[in-house]
Amino acid sequence: MTIAERFAEFLMGTRYDEIAVQAVDHATMIVASTLASAACGRHIDSSRIVSEIEIQRGGTPEAAVWFEKDIRLPVIGAARANALMSDAAASDDSDLRNIVHAGTPLTATALAVAEATGAGGKDILAAIVVGYEAAGRIGESIMPKFDYRGHHGCMGAAFGPTIAAARLYGLTAEQAAHALGLTATTIGGLTKAANTSIAREYHAGNATMAGISAVQAAMRGYTAELAIFEKERGFCRLFGGSDGSVILEDLGTDWDIVTDMALKLVPGGHPYHALGEAGANAAREAEVAPEQVAKIIVSRPGMKNLTGPLHPKNLIDMAHSPAYFTAAGVRDHEFGWIHASQEKIDDPVIHTLIDKVIVGPEPTENLAAYRQGATVAIEMTDGRTVANTVFVPNGAGCLGVDWADVDEKCRALMPAAPLDDVKIESVLSKMRQFRTLSHASELTGHLV
């Protein structure tokens, strides 16, 4: 059997009651987190444009466009529009290995297909867990060369919606293997486009469409090259220089949604969260005022210089500016959702501190412990120095995620939808009961 066939057998054959409780909890949290990010992103131009396109295109009313009253579209159109909403706000989740936002296309796909098929809470959550496993393992099989070569993380993320849709549409393992093959030959994306433009969230929509389209074709008998992952000049060889065998290693011993997933509990790019967190921790510990700062030294494995925009002017700049995260954390002794606001992005005190951020020597100890982690040292004008290290950012599944933090995120972002306090609490109540829902519309119906 090929890698695709063996992997599909595992992904399609795993039952809900065989999945660890923590994995199911994290899947539920991903749904809540994705909806919160979507509420914040629905008015961003990229999201608005794609929603308008899909609404104008129309078609069979199978699934809801989130936060839109009485607008239902074909599964693929609704899922694409909803994925763009969430990814546009850059406030969803990440795989700590490669910063792929796997949860957004997964949630958008799972809820849309479930609305069309009548699937309930347990089936949706199982589809998200195994979909995350598909995205994570296939993404890992092409690390790190896919990134060095300029390919975007959607190269792995697309396999999440593929498997989620395959399960919820009721495909056989063989059909799912062909769907994986079709997705492998479809998906593409460039990191350079994503780092500096709204093409980033366009990738999320493409990953969602690629997965659903592959499944809808495979369920009707469309076939693909089943050896596409291990074949010479196939997916893994071409994008990662590997034989793809890592995809099948130790299947079922743990779940990527537990070991490698991280929810965003603050805005912006996940690689920079630890910088904001460590900067805030250090400044708070020593009660550092901005005018006392002489120099801010940042370090992490592999960090040679400050990347991204040094002085951000907008949300896209802010999301990719490690200097901003660091300076904002030092300035305010915390880093939170408020730091995605234009008021904070324009804060002159933060910009003064940005000019004091420099890159120090790379750490030499505990290198394996740095999972998107960082160390920040603040040198003060009186000669004192205070430092803090964050090995793994808050919100990482491996640290455990508290529902209170997810609730806080939803309460902070969902008013932008807009949803009032009563609606938000209703959504949060449904999330806590998600396992018992008999139909996805019991949740999506509360989003208007």
What label would you give each PLM region?
Residues 1-99, 195, 199-209, 213-448:
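Terminal-appendage/accessory-domain detector
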Residues 24, 28, 32, 106, ...:
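Hydrophobic face of alpha-helices
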Residues 34-35, 106-113, 128-135, 158-169, ...:
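Buried hydrophobic packing segments
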Residues 83-139:
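Hydrophobic alpha-helical hairpins/lids featuring a short glycine-rich hinge
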Residues 86, 105-107, 133-134, 185-189, ...:
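Short connector loops/turns at beta-strand edges and beta->alpha or beta->beta junctions
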Residues 101-102, 151-152, 273:
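Histidine-centered active-site/metal-ligand motif
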Residues 114-213, 225-232:
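Glycine-rich, mobile lid/loop segments that gate access to catalytic sites or pores
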